[in-house]
Amino acid sequence: MIFLSIGPNYTWAQAWRHMWTRGNKANASKLQSLLTKKYDAQKALLFSQGRGALAEAVRLATGGEGKVAVTSMTCFVVIEAIRTAGCEPLYVDVDRHTLQFNADNLRRATKSEDVRAVVVQNMLGIPVEIDEIMKVAHEHDMAVIEDLAHAVGGQYADGREIGTVGDYTMLSFGRDKMIDTINGGALVIRTTDVKNVVQPPLEEVPTIQQLRDRIYPLFACLVRGLFASGLGKCIHWFAYKTKIVVRSADDGTHPERTLPYWQAKLAYEQLKTIDKKVTMRLKNQDIYQKELTDFSVAASSNGVRWPLLVENRSEVLAKLKQAGVYAEDVWYEVPV
């Protein structure tokens, strides 16, 4: 069986190590140093969630007021982070082929609005036209926040690494991401023109949440292993019903919480080897591109996801399930 969700980044051995990993302050410092070097930055902060890092990026970029331009194809936690920072989202239309907004759409959307920043997401690892978007941002005095939730290890068309162009770079270490510690995130500050006082997250993650983060990979391996018998489905239902496991989007936004040391250690190890992971995923993507050309959109630059445009999604999911491929953890039914 092939699972496209439920802990796909973890084997039993990796899940066991995740459960028992220990860390210390030095691990957090090593991760911060790696981030500042990799993204040519002034400072790096570690958060318990990617959305917490994004909320702080928005607060610093805008002063906590005005609007923030964001792609209309996005996750609701992005909107939650923007509002946590005191701002409101301004949705920008996306292109059907790239699934990203372009410079013209951004210019039209922001023409008569008080937009203080733009979040560049590079959704599904598909790179935007970054130079043109940067021009629009400079014309309208907007800070540029590169959201790397889907884009770690990817490149723009000119070869520059995603995350090395804007004023702020946000990373997510959430489940199913390129760097996967179940929860976690980072903010890399690449500008000196901040509009607010930097507030490093100091509050510890509650013990119950850390326990959930530790056991999730083992839970996922168990569910996957027993899924065909039907027992895995029962375990999955029971764990969520009793809140032994919670959905990644259900915990709110907490920019005050810092990344636990043990997760910082795991994130550092994964970031060090990200190029190898990207190479492997792009090889797999090439196979999909050749076999499913009629359904594909623009290619991802890091292989984090490979989207297909189909007429009848339910029918496709049912046929995949018959073939032993479980892809039912879909994102949203409709755009924002």
Which residues are covered by each model-predicted region?
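Conserved glycine-rich beta-strand-loop-beta hairpin in the small C-terminal domain of fold type I
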Residues: 16, 255-271, 278, 282-289, ...
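Short hydrophobic/aromatic beta-strand micro-patches
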Residues: 188, 307-311
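Active-site PLP-lysine loop of aminotransferase-like
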Residues: 170-182, 199-225
